[in-house]
Amino acid sequence: MVPTMHGRSQPPHLVLALFALAAGISLPAAAEEPAPVVVELYTSQGCSSCPPADALFGEIVRQPGVVALGFHVDYWNYIGWHDPFSSKKFTYRQKQYAMSFRQTGVYTPQIVVQGKRGEVGSDRAAVMAAIADAKKAKPMATVAIEKLGGDRLRAVVRAGSEAKGADIWLALFDRRHTTKILRGENEGKTLTNVHVVREWRKLGRFEGEKAEFDLVAANEKGDKRAGVAVVVQQPMAGPILGAGVAYVE
């Protein structure tokens, strides 16, 4: 029977801690919650190779400890279907990764993990291994996002001197979109895309021990978005140092 105090049963871990304290035994520290790992999917509704990667990404977004961001590129728009979520900004970001990884060019589908490793987006084994490896690393920056009410939030970034000069990015994304494809390589298919990034912009650079930003989960036109992510990253699409995510819808 578990010992009681004031007539209430005490949790076994508390009893163990009290026993250890009385006996002078030190217990191992509680495991820290792993820092979020940023997983970016570069995809297009006009790419016939992308649906399997989109499906894998749909599984990844449900993983704990993952900040999943779906970037739709624009370089497949010319073959018949204009991806409504595509942006030149997202293509440019992928091109920066291509230079960082010393690739000869860009391709879809591609998944980039923590800004350090790029894999074919439909290669489940390689992608999952990259995520598992990234989760083992200690973050160099932490991001806490507090909901203030409605679509207003506040992000607080904390880091040491090693993060000085890092870029701080804001992503606004929608949880899910289902689209009937009328032309192009995926003509006749109905595609589902999740964590679709709608806006990507720089908030500033990290210059000290702490940085705060008041955010609105909407674009300049007032279109609201379901999710907000803040990413701390070395310049020119370098390694990601830390990230945080929050949902308003």
Q: What is the predicted role of each segment?
A:
Residues 6, 22, 30-32:
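Glycine/alanine-rich phosphate-binding loops at beta-alpha junctions
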Residues 28-29, 245:
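Short, low-complexity polar/charged micro-motifs in intrinsically disordered terminal tails
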Residues 13-25:
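Bacterial N-terminal signal peptides
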Residues 30-105:
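Active-site-proximal cofactor/substrate-binding loop regions of enzyme domains
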